[in-house]
From Swiss-Prot:
Residues 1420-1536 form the PX domain. The gene is PIK3C2A. Phosphorylated on Ser-259 during mitosis and upon UV irradiation; which does not change enzymatic activity but leads to proteasomal degradation. Phosphorylated upon insulin stimulation; which may lead to enzyme activation. GO terms for cellular component: clathrin-coated vesicle; cytoplasm; nucleus; phosphatidylinositol 3-kinase complex; plasma membrane; trans-Golgi network; vesicle. The lineage of its organism: Eukaryota, Metazoa, Chordata, Craniata, Vertebrata. This is Phosphatidylinositol 4-phosphate 3-kinase C2 domain-containing subunit alpha. Its cofactor is Ca(2+); Mg(2+). Only slightly inhibited by wortmannin and LY294002. Activated by clathrin and insulin. CDD domains: C2A_PI3K_class_II (cd04012), C2B_PI3K_class_II (cd08381), PI3Ka_II (cd00869), PI3Kc_C2_alpha (cd05176), PX_PI3K_C2_alpha (cd07289). Residues 680-839 form the C2 PI3K-type domain. Residues 419-507 form the PI3K-RBD domain. Residues 19-31 have a biased composition (Basic and acidic residues). The modification N-acetylalanine is found at residue 2.
Length: 1685
């Protein structure tokens, strides 16, 4: 079990010191009586002395010395004072060497010295050694306590208030050695002890970290000579301090001397009547009490002044003052009592050189800040490595420094299939028209360049083809010469959108290379901080020199003012306020030394001025006037003494703040010995001291706080977490939580892996009685996690951490900000500072890498294993991921790891199965690692996850990943950026890899910049990302930095506009938008700027009139920019503020990777991939897809209930694709893209799907937007999920897929596409799990742990076969298509959107079947119009179409158009909207009972419609000649194709199938494995019935011969369809291959009838001997009229 101390931190051990005699207790009345008597006697003696001396302050120095040595002021006289007189009689010049050495050993010599004021615990000849003792011999690194017999006798205890001689001022023992030993001295404090008003001999060792300057006592010139002589003796040099030590000590001495009359000030150090200042019994701070007691005894002649004035509190306020750097003279120890802190070289930082007068002081504020500002060693090492990396990429290398962007490529299978040839248009300089020709998409770009050059040059042998490039028109992007044309994403998009491929032929010299690095960039040294000024940081800056220097200047100005003016009370208040400002600037850290120093300063300033003047008048040789002006500068001035101590405490805090994050060897060359960690058996321990900077809200809302301390490696705990004690808050300058508790982990340091992390999580217990608590009236809640911080136990040099650390504990509110909240400009996040004290042993502990065995490992043959063992091992190896492995599986895999070399992809599973990563086991693990076959980059990506923290593993993984292409790396860059969080140190192989790729590819550098900039908002890792970003900007070159600066500025401007528009009222938003965009326009007047979304797009100005905003909740902006390339189209993007777009980025990234997987396998699902970029917290930019609308906007054209109708989508596509060829192409695009969307949204668990975040392009491509809910986190409607279906597939989508209301073979194609795409993604299950796992630390609200990945793993069904997965997904399609909940969800959303947009309306309604509007001026006036005839058609349903004969003016031959009854009705309805006050002819819309699509109804409607047209044309010219009527009669492409029908006598097409015949086909998948025959019945098509009605088909099979019909199997029944999809598996088990070769498979398709016998639709008999049962056979089989069982 872990051990936790209850108070001091270390385990208690009995001290061997005898307990000192307790002084007799004195109650309050006795104290008052004694004080009155003492004051009366003192006043009487003073009157006598004053009459004799006459207060002649201008007398000689000798008279003053006599007064100084008078004993009249003491109420008690000690015989030891006689030794002072003897010291004055010594003739220094006549002393021999032996006499000097005798004086050195004289015990009474110390009494001749001037009394010393030990303001702080110090190690010097002039400080009492009662708190110091020699430690016993240490056998361990951190013993539980240092105890042993003291080598010094205990001092006498004086329960008296009277002044004592100098030698006994602080209980100094004159028999103790004058100088301390050169060995380390330990300051010891008690563990648990009651409160004592007299000094104790402590038992807990304590050793100060920093230097401890002292006050040098004032000595006469004679005494100075004497001491100098003594210092030169051999005895002193042998047993005392060396001269070098004396110089160090002298350098610490303040030039502000202590008053020699300090012993005349009475004190009551044994009496403490102030309950506020008394330490608690369970947490006594003896050292601090002794310190306070001694100071107060010198500052107050009247002891009640200190007692009463101490209760006064000075209000703290924020008042900035300019401060001047002053020398300081005192340093305090601000460390925890419970820790041994060894003095290091850092302590010498306090020591400054002597001034010309021979005195010394501590460093000035400027010199200290220069020391603080020095870069730590890890940063310096990182900077050196970046400099080395930069030299590998000289600016002269065109391959790595092209200066322009390369068009990304994607490998695509079956490029040379249909439509393999494309038309290319190339602009060549000197040619007025572009050169156009047709080429094969598989041709390389270099061949295309040669074809283009043939138009320019006759002889290509004289031309350097390699010096030419093809630039994309409208973009600053160049095709890659060594890749085929069709592999470029730009060419693929042009083919997808069916747009012209326009390119431009340029030479390298003519190509814009304005992003290339220059010679100046190569010569500029690397500076990690120089270029970060342009980055907005959402957190408080680390301490820098200039702000703190200003605060220090202000502090010293206030100090100087306080020491000079008469009214010191107000001035001291300003000093304290300045101190508070400094502490606030240092993250609210207020050390114990600062707290105590402020208290003493308050007491000192409240002393009566008469007593202070008395002390000052006795000090120097100046007259009264000089004393009055310079008395405040007197070192004996109590205010001066307190200020000196306060100054020292401030400077100690500065050093602590600056050095807490550094390596122990950073500050100075360590002189410690080094010990290897694997030989260290001590347990890990540290002290949690306090948490600083607590907000007032926490104080009111939380009652107690505690910490959970845990050790982790590879993302798992090494030991059970330890909980600290529960404590409340304290208030000084700021609120703080103080534990001062020792935590001991029962794990030896030798067992700690190098990458061990210490995690400290702060919890708060809610104050249930607090009225401000939001849950005060609710059920009591459990503790809340308030924040967390992690710390590596070994630094980048592999030294174990030691000393005090200030750890920034970021609160949960910062890491999980409220979505939609807009951060105010200038807002700086606050952070809690956790002070943790680690032991500082006498040696540095270093982690050394074990020697790796380079001998060849014996690789075992998997085939030598027993069958059951081999099968078990193969089952584990074939699992998709290590996430599903049990403990038993891991142990088994690790045991058999040497059998797995032939399965290299299983390495992550093997390493994840390692039982531990202790030092003793690393050699064998590393040997296995280095001999393992190289992994593919996407497989090695898993080794960058949190499960693999080992530096050797991660470094080797990066080596394997280096084989990845730049375009693949660009796609996966977000995961690599997140993987930086799992690196234990700043300078890692991963950082080097990313920066090296960024140096060679501008697209990677650009994307990496925006990803790192966005990651700065992750406050826990912001410092690391800041360093990497600084390195990227430093090596990227001046031109790239300038471009990124412009992009950042543009984003800031657009963010400001978006916020203003969002906050404006609805009616004023457009005005605010136009005005605010003027400022953005002024930016473009000075700059051209690349688009952050896509740097190849360059904008030169805004098109303000085209800019608008969307009416959704976030009110995003539509920003339209003019392309800088005149051959390019305008640039449209959406800028959104108030929503976190990082989840959208991740979802779109996953969809893009899926699309690339499909393309590599030859499956083009025509996915719409648009770009999305998070440019900051809750803001970002999204690419707008042109010519697209939401499903809601399309559906509500048919009313609010349009989502329940089947035709809206099909009719909308027909409007934009009027010809049959165009509509068929659009329908095909819809089928493919809808299949891709169904698979992608299901696999990723994308929820909150409604008709406002599903969009349709006019070309038929469907795509999804707004990915706020994913991984199965559904949007709730009360207690119900709004997303009830697996994915969105509605009847109107099925209508487009089928081409009508009934299922067709097109729906079977859709199902096959879905299943094929699903199975291809399933094969990459491990990749998607790894990619999502790496994004867990990104802070996305719905991806926080491994548990969130369970949805994806379950959705992909990794353990099933492809056939089983096909059946599974087919059932999902059926479930989604049959879900009425989706349509209700659409309806609810339609109703909800009415409050934003109302019912759809148009000022100029247009006809749904015509995308444009025409006028009679274009087409000519109509002379005659009539309904000529009607025809029956199938498309695929039977319907009637009416032929309208039109004769226009100036035409001889009439024209014909074809319109349905619904289209006539649409014309009438929209004329009623345009002319609501006009009397229009009545429309024949009477209800028809029964079937409408019959000949009799069509004949009647022909007459009625003809009458309607005659009345319409005879109406007013405003109606008859309006554009809507002209558009109705305008011929469409379908009219031109079908016009011949009207001229023929028999106008029939699309005749129905002939009944009575057998027809159709069935698609089967036949396979055999593990003694089982699998027959998957996939589809049947074109079934024929006798009566022409739609059948209810099902499939039945037998294995013949089968006399008893035991082999009968059948599928489910599909209702009312000629083209059913089954995708059902029929299984025959227990048959060998030999048996099956003698069998035949008989398959029959029948129609199930309820009122009659099932009838036969067709069948087929397949001899199984004709099949290769070792592989799957998928084929269509024609149905025949064969007999069946």
């Amino acid at each position: 079990m872990a051990q936790i101390s209850s108070n001091s931190g270390f385990k208690e051990c009995p001290s061997s010191h005898p307990e000192p005699t307790r002084a007799k207790d004195v109650d309050k009345e006795e104290a008052l009586q004694m004080e009155a008597e003492a004051l009366a006697k003192l006043q009487k003696d003073r009157q006598v002395t004053d009459n004799q001396r006459g207060f002649e302050l201008s007398s000689s120095t000798r008279k003053k010395a006599q007064v100084y040595n008078k004993q009249d002021y003491d109420l008690m006289v000690f015989p030891e004072s006689d030794s002072q007189k003897r010291a004055l009689d010594i003739d220094v010049e006549k002393l021999t060497q032996a006499e000097l050495e005798k004086l050195l050993l004289d015990d009474s010599l110390e009494t001749r010295k001037t009394p010393v004021l030990p303001v702080t615990p110090i190690l010097s000849p002039s400080f009492s050694a009662q708190l110091y003792f020699r430690p016993t011999i240490q056998r361990g690194q951190w013993p539980p306590g240092l105890s042993g017999p003291s080598t010094y006798a205990l001092p006498s205890i004086y329960p008296s208030t009277y002044s004592k001689q100098a030698a006994f001022q602080n209980g100094f023992n004159p028999r103790m050695p004058t100088f301390p030993s050169t060995e380390p001295i330990y300051l010891s404090l008690p563990g648990q002890s009651p409160y004592f008003s007299y000094p104790l001999t402590p038992a807990t060792p304590f050793h100060p970290q920093g230097s401890l300057p002292i006050y040098r006592p004032v000595v006469s010139p004679d005494m100075a000579k004497l001491f100098d002589k003594i210092a030169s003796t051999s005895e002193f040099l042998k047993n005392g301090k060396a001269r070098a030590d004396l110089e160090i000590t002298d350098s610490k001495v303040s030039n502000l001397q202590v008053s020699p009359k300090s012993e005349d000030i009475s004190k009551f150090d044994w009496l403490d009547l102030d309950p506020l200042s008394k330490p608690k019994v369970d947490n006594v701070e003896v050292l601090d009490h002794e310190e306070e007691k001694n100071v107060s005894s010198l500052l107050a002649k009247d002891p009640w002044d200190a007692v009463l004035l101490e209760e006064r509190s000075t209000a703290n306020c924020h008042l900035e003052r300019k401060m001047n750097g002053k020398s300081l003279s005192v340093a305090t120890v601000t460390r925890s009592q419970s820790l041994n802190i060894r003095t290091t070289q850092l302590a010498k930082a306090h020591i400054s050189q002597k001034d010309p007068n021979g005195t010394s002081s501590l460093p000035t504020g400027s010199s200290l800040l220069q020391e603080v500002e020095v870069q730590n060693e890890e940063m310096a090492a990182f900077s050196r490595s970046i400099t080395k990396l930069k030299t590998k990429f000289p600016y002269t290398n065109h391959h790595t420094n092209p200066g322009y962007l390369l068009s990304p490529v994607t490998a695509q299978r079956n490029i040379c299939g249909e439509n393999a040839s494309v038309k290319v248009s190339i602009d060549i300089e000197g040619f007025q028209l572009p050169v156009t020709f047709t080429c094969d998409v598989s041709s390389t770009v270099e061949i295309i360049i040669m074809q283009a050059l043939c138009w320019v040059h006759d002889d290509l042998n004289q031309v350097d083809v390699g010096s030419y490039v093809l630039k994309v028109c409208g973009q600053e992007e160049v095709l890659q010469n060594n890749h085929c044309l069709g592999s470029h994403e730009h060419i693929q998009n042009c083919r997808k959108w069916d747009t012209e491929i326009r390119l431009q032929l340029l030479t390298f010299s003519a190509m814009c290379q304005n992003l290339a690095r220059t010679a100046e960039d190569d010569e500029t040294p690397v500076d990690l901080n120089k270029h970060l000024y342009q980055i907005e940081k959402p957190y408080k800056e680390a301490m820098t020199r200039h702000p703190v220097e200003e605060l220090l200047d202000s502090y010293h100005n206030q100090v100087e003012l306080a020491l000079q003016i008469e009214n010191q009370h107000r001035a001291v208040d300003q000093v304290i306020k300045a101190v508070r400002k400094i502490c606030s600037a240092l993250d609210g850290v207020e050390t114990l030394a600062i707290t105590e120093s402020v208290k003493k300063l308050k007491r000192a300033v409240n002393l009566p001025r008469s007593k202070t003047a008395d002390v000052a008048s006795l000090f120097g040789g100046e007259d009264t006037s000089k004393s009055s002006t310079r008395g405040s500068l007197n070192p004996e001035n109590p205010v001066q003494v307190s200020i000196n101590q306060l100054t020292a405490a401030i400077y100690d805090l500065l050093r602590l703040h600056a050095n807490s994050g550094r390596s122990p060897t950073d500050c100075a060359q360590s002189s410690k010995s080094v010990k290897e960690a694997w030989t260290t058996t001590e347990q890990l321990q540290f002290t949690i001291f306090a948490a600083h900077g607590i907000s007032s809200n926490w104080v009111s809302n939380y009652e107690k706080y505690y910490l959970i301390c845990s050790l982790s490696h590879n993302g798992k705990d090494l030991f059970k977490p330890i909980q600290s004690k529960k404590v409340g808050t304290y208030k000084n300058f700021f609120y703080l939580i103080k534990w001062d508790e020792l935590i001991i982990f029962p794990i030896q340091i030798s067992q700690l892996p190098l990458e061990s992390l210490l995690h400290l999580t702060l919890f708060g217990i809610l104050n249930q009685s607090s009225g401000s608590s939001p849950d005060s009236n609710k059920q009591r809640k459990g503790p809340e996690a308030l924040g967390k911080v992690s710390l590596p136990l070994f630094d980048f040099k592999r030294f174990l951490t030691c000393g005090t650390k200030l750890l920034y504990l970021w609160t949960s509110s910062h890491t999980n900000s409220v979505p939609g909240a807009v951060t105010k400009k200038g807002y700086v996040m606050e952070r809690i500072v956790l002070q943790v004290d680690f032991p500082s042993p006498a040696f540095d502990i270093i982690y050394t890498t074990p020697q790796v065995d380079r001998s060849i490992i014996q690789q075992h043959n998997l085939e030598t294993l027993e069958n059951d063992v081999k099968g078990k091992l193969l089952d584990i190896l074939h699992k998709d991921s290590s996430l599903g492995l049990s403990k038993e599986d891991k142990a088994f895999l690790w045991e058999k790891r040497y059998y797995c070399f032939k399965h290299p992809n299983c390495l992550p599973k093997i390493l994840a199965s390692a039982p531990n990563w202790k030092w003793v086991n690393l050699a064998k693990t590393y040997s296995l690692l280095h001999q393992w076959p190289a992994l593919y980059p996407l497989i090695a990506l898993e080794l960058l996850d949190s499960k693999f923290a080992d530096q050797e593993v991660r470094s080797l993984a990066v080596t394997w990943i280096e084989a990845i292409s730049d375009d693949e790396l660009t796609d996966l860059l977000p995961q690599f950026v997140q993987a930086l969080k799992y690196e234990i140190y700043l300078n890692s192989s991963l950082v080097q890899f990313l920066l090296s790729r960024a140096l060679g590819n501008i697209q990677i550098a650009h994307n990496l910049y925006w990803l790192l900039k966005d990651a700065l908002h992750d406050v826990q890792f912001s410092t690391r990302y800041e360093h990497v970003l600084g390195a990227l900007l430093s090596v990227g070159g001046k031109r790239l930095r300038e471009e990124l600066r412009k992009q950042t500025k543009l984003v800031q401007l657009l963010g400001g506009v978006a916020e203003k528009v969002r906050q404006a009222s609805g009616s004023a938003r457009q005005v605010v938008l136009q005005r605010s965009m003027e400022r953005v326009q002024s930016f473009f007047q000075k700059n051209k700027c690349r688009l952050p979304l896509k740097p190849s797009l360059v904008a030169k100005e805004l098109s303000i009139k085209s800019c608008s905003f969307f009416s959704s909740n976030a009110v995003p902006l539509k920003v339209t920019m003019v392309n800088a390339d005149p051959m390019g189209e305008e640039i449209n993007v959406m800028f959104k503020v108030g929503e976190d777009l990082r989840q959208d980025m991740l979802a779109l990234q996953m969809i893009k990777i899926m699309d690339k997987i499909w393309l590599k396998e030859g499956l083009d699902l025509r996915m719409v991939i648009f770009k999305c970029l998070s440019t900051g917290r809750d803001r970002g930019m999204v690419e707008l897809v042109p010519a697209s609308d939401t499903l809601r906007k399309i559906q509500v054209e048919y009313g609010v209930t349009g989502s329940f109708k089947d035709k809206p989508l099909a009719e909308w596509l027909r409007k934009y694709n009027p010809s049959e060829e165009e509509y068929e192409k659009a329908s095909e695009n819809f089928i493919y893209s809808c299949a891709g969307c169904c698979v992608a949204t299901y696999v990723l668990g994308i929820c909150d799907r409604h008709n406002d975040n599903i969009m349709l392009r006019s070309t038929g491509h469907m795509f999804h937007i707004d990915f706020g809910k994913f991984l199965g986190h559904a949007q709730m409607f009360g207690t119900f999920k709004r997303d009830r279906a697996p994915f969105v597939l509605t009847s109107d989508m099925a209508y487009v897929i089928n081409g009508g209301e009934k299922p067709t073979i097109r729906f079977q194609l859709f199902v096959d596409l879905c299943c094929q795409a699903y199975n291809l993604i399933r094969k990459q299950t491990n990749l998607f799990l790894n990619l999502l796992s790496l994004m867990i630390p990104s802070g996305l609200p719905e991806l926080t742990s491994i548990q969130d990945l369970k949805y994806v793993r379950d959705a992909l069904q990794p353990q099933t076969t492809d056939a089983e997965a096909t059946i599974f997904f087919t059932r999902l399609i059926e479930s989604s298509l049959g879900s009425i909940a989706t349509k209700f969800n659409f309806l609810i959303h339609n109703l909800a959107q009415l409050r934003f947009s109302g019912l759809p309306s148009n000022d100029e309604p247009i006809l749904s079947f015509s995308p444009k509007t025409y006028s009679f001026k274009q087409d000519g006036r109509i002379k005659e119009v009539s309904v000529f005839t009607y025809h029956k058609k199938y498309n695929p349903d039977k319907h009637y179409i009416y032929v309208v004969r039109i004769l226009r003016e100036g035409q001889i031959e009439p024209s014909f158009v074809f319109r349905t009854f619904d289209e006539f009705q649409e014309l009438h309805n929209k004329l009623s909207i345009i002319f609501p006050l006009w009397k229009l002819p009545g429309f024949p819309n009477r209800m028809v009972l029964g079937r409408t699509h019959i000949k009799d109804v069509a004949a009647k409607r022909k007459i009625e419609l003809n009458s309607y047209l005659q009345s319409l044309m005879n109406a007013s010219t405003d109606v008859a000649e309006c554009d809507l009527v002209c558009t109705f009669f305008h011929p469409l492409l379908r009219d031109e194709k079908a016009e011949g029908i009207a001229r023929s006598a028999d106008a029939g097409s699309f005749s129905p199938p002939t009944p009575g015949q057998i027809g159709g086909a069935v698609k089967l998948s036949i396979s055999y494995r593990n003694g089982t025959l699998f027959i998957m019945v996939m589809h049947t098509k074109d079934l024929v019935t006798e009566d022409g009605a739609d059948p209810n088909p099902y499939v039945k099979t037998y294995l013949l011969p089968d006399n008893h019909k035991t082999s009968k199997r059948k599928t489910k029944i599909s209702r009312k369809t000629r083209n059913p999809t089954f995708n059902e598996m029929l299984v025959y088990s227990g048959y060998s291959k030999e048996t099956l070769r003698q069998r035949e498979l008989q398959l029959s398709v029948l129609s199930a009838e309820s009122l009659r016998e099932n009838f036969f639709l067709g069948g087929v008999t397949l001899p199984l001997k004709d099949f290769n049962l070792s592989k799957e056979t998928v084929k269509w089989y024609q149905l025949t009229a064969a007999t069946y069982l």
